[in-house]
Amino acid sequence: VAGATAVAATLAVGLGAPSLDTAQAAAGRNDVPSAVPAAFTPGVNNGQVRAIAQVGSTMVVGGTFSSVSASGSTAVINRTRVFAFDAGTGAISSFAPNVNGNVETVAAGPTAGTVYIGGSFTSVNGVKAPRIALLSLSNGQAVTTFKPGAGFNGIVQRIRTSGGRLFVGGSFTKYQSFKHVGLATLDPATGNNDPYMNLNMAGRHNDTGSGRVEKTGALDFDISGDGSQMAVIGNFRTVGTEARTQLALVSLGATSATVRTDFKTNDYEPLCYNSAFDTTVRKVMFAPSGSWFVVTATGGGNSSLCDAASRFETNASGQDLHPTWISHAGGDTLYGLAVTDEAVFLGGHQRWMNNQLGNDSPGPGAVPRPGLAAVAADTGLPLSWNPGRNPRGAGAYSLLATDAGIWVGSDTPWIGNHKYKRPRIAFFPYTGGYNLPSTAEPSLTGLRVGGQVSPGSSPVLYRVDAGGATVAANDGGPDWAADQSDPSPVRNSGSNSAGYAPVPNVDSTVPASTPSAIFDSERWDPSGGDEMAWSFPVAAGHSVKVRLYFANRCTCTSAEDSRQFNVAIDGNPVLSNFDIVKSATDQTGTMREFTVTSDGAVDIGFGHITENPLVNGIEIIDPSVPTVAATVTDAVTQTAYDGSTVGATTTVNGGGIDWSNTRGAFVIGGSLFYAKANGLLYRRTVSGTTYGPEVVLNPYHDPLWMNISNGSGGTYNGTDPNLAAQLPSLTGLFFDNSRIYYSTSGDPRLHYRSFNADSGIVYPIESFAPTSLDFSTVTSMTLNGGRLYYVRTDGQLWSVAFSNGAVSGTPSLVDNPAVSGHSWTGRSLFAAPNQ
């Protein structure tokens, strides 16, 4: 999070319509630029590039530098804090004003060949110009008709033209003799005060009385493409008469600007590291449509919007609004920002992105993105584009999107890992880039089953990993079901879960086929409230074996007699004053087995004696059922189905995929995505029965950045997401609206995460979809045409409506194998790819 406060670039294209910082997709251009920077750009020899703008065919750059050089040349050309060059060739122009302070913002002037500059300077070419000036690009001299007079009494951070007005933001309290705290409007031609903007800012974000102190004012603002909305960020707690902390949305009316009373977020209230930062926001920009905007921030930590980019919807209404998505760096500042229709480009000194679970280190799901990143506009997940900047310096302060490509201004000389020398300014052209993949589903002509399963039999009725995630079975039987939901269909509420490192020991009571991982989590019952109770439906009259697994993992009860509790099954005591440590020693897994005859349900109850009862695993076995191993093949079958009529089944080419080890698949945009039991996702192009080569989706370990020093005591290596541990237990997988949905063995919930089809990156944190369907009965599933098709444990194919991320309506039977003879049981169910 360290680094100087900076403001990213402005781009102004004249008066009337607002100047644009966003780039709409030009006809024929790619969605994402090349990761190789153009070679023609000039070099900035020192300092920082703070602002970039395009004025006609000329690029204007502002910052803190004192000299530049032509591309490939070491000859020094003196340029004081601002210079210009040809946008197509990089040729440095004769524009060379002498500015006595930093230039923070640049924007096209009101007439061709003129440019506004703003910053901390007080003179240009030795002539008084308090923090704002309009210059001629031909000679660098001030345009004499623009007369700011006494100008601003504080730093100008942002200049923007819209609707025949010049909007100015910064840390000032007046313009000339007029009171303007943070925001002002001027006549763009004369510099006269325009009373249109009469919203004064007050207060500071860090109002604790200690820590960092910065001036009140606007750090950045942007105006929507239709000129109706302004998003402004900075160090303030009120704008006009409205309480707003660091972010406000302003309605730009015909005669005055007013703070929108229906748009308020409290998510920028957290102080984060206020010893280092007063305000934490850094840059704001609208999408080309004006329907949403993004804010970048510094500040430290992941419990808030600090060190993250956040998307907000312009038409949202409420007094406690939250972002649509948050893209975390995980402890590193994000500065520069450029927004296009397809992507959000981010500059800073970040080491990783997708790092919601990390703080100054790569958490699960983190991917290397040194100093530059592009994230998807709809989810905030990183795209594949990953040129990087190593070393990262303090940051990439200034990003600018044009129809030709993405400009990046920073304080470092290299793009890539010391690969392309582009001192402090680089250009990534759309030529040589790529288009984002389609996510359209195939038209439904048939359903394919990959990894045909001939069911075996198992005496196991239930297995539960108490308090933990799904644990794969070691014996071919059912997996140990996750116990992480509350309420649970087999347990009452009020208990807690805990997790531990792998258990060091298990005793001889534990069957060899039982995975020791079940002892790495527990469910324990605190005192007060109802005692912990479990209930498992079992046909009345059946004699079953109940196995209860225990381990004392908490160091707080490592001594004998420090934890004792009772256990009863169907109301009959089976363990009294049970002491795990006395029975099996500390940090050791043990098992107790009891034979009972069911009365329709097996009820297990726990009772307090000393400390809290706990259980690590529960297994219920019907010894009358023989163990017969299931068989799985790599065969793929296709059954004709158009959404209404089930036709014939044929065996089709499976592309050489090891389908027996898949755990779900889906087809979108001409690609087959599938999960394997090894914890990885894969992709192949597919057309009918023709498959491309297998590509492993492992963006968390980009070979370009593996084991490369990040300059902060570590490397850029990312970390696998926790989804990897779930994939072996998947029972179904499908894609919808930039998300993957999945079910896991023994779990009634429908899980989901955001997913990017370009990069293969998944969101680090999972969520759960509303559903009336019990997904513990699902063995495979796919989505097509708004219908979720799923195979139940009895082999029947059913469907149910699925829209807006939720199951709805009543399920209907599609096909009963007992009648039709079709086989739907397999590792993966997916819609047949179109040719």
Where are these regions (language model features)?
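Extracytoplasmic surface signature
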Residues: 13-454, 630-650, 657, 663, ...
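N-terminal export and membrane-targeting signals
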Residues: 1-8
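A recurrent domain-boundary module in secreted/ectodomain proteins
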Residues: 421-441, 604, 609-626, 815-835
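Well-ordered beta-strand scaffold positions
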Residues: 127, 469, 572, 670-671, ...
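Extracellular protease catalytic domains of secreted zymogens
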Residues: 316-335, 463, 487-498, 767
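Compositionally biased, intrinsically disordered or flexible polar/acidic segments
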Residues: 15, 450-628
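Extracellular glycan/ECM-engagement signal in secreted proteins
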Residues: 776, 787-791, 796-800, 804-835
